[in-house]
UniProtKB/Swiss-Prot annotation:
Keywords, sorted A to Z: Disulfide bond, Ion channel impairing toxin, Knottin, Secreted, Signal, Toxin
Organism: Cyriopagopus hainanus (Chinese bird spider)
InterPro entries xrefs: Huwentoxin-1 (IPR011696), Huwentoxin_CS1 (IPR013140)
Protein name from the UniProt record: U3-theraphotoxin-Hhn1a 8
GO terms of molecular function: ion channel inhibitor activity; toxin activity
Predominant location: secreted
Pfam family, one: Toxin_12
Family per similarity comment: Belongs to the neurotoxin 10 (Hwtx-1) family. 51 (Hntx-8) subfamily. Hntx-8 sub-subfamily.
Amino acid sequence: MVNMKASMFLTFAGLVLLFVVCYASGSEEKEFPKEMLSSIFAVDNDFKQEERDCAGYMRECKEKLCCSGYVCSSRWKWCVLPAPWRR
């Protein structure tokens, strides 16, 4: 099961890379592949830099309040889903 997931992920990543290379080779701009790859990897950095007023799932809640739908675990100080079996 794990091997199937890994092979599907690698196949998908290969197809995306093939698309980027083919699209870049058809483009007249020589800097396009670098710009395309940097914009793809910059999206991840944008999400990391985005600050929230509340802490999401499994985020530290010592200084911030948890977002709606989550509660601060008294034992671990992480935002978790509320459950009837938790104290």
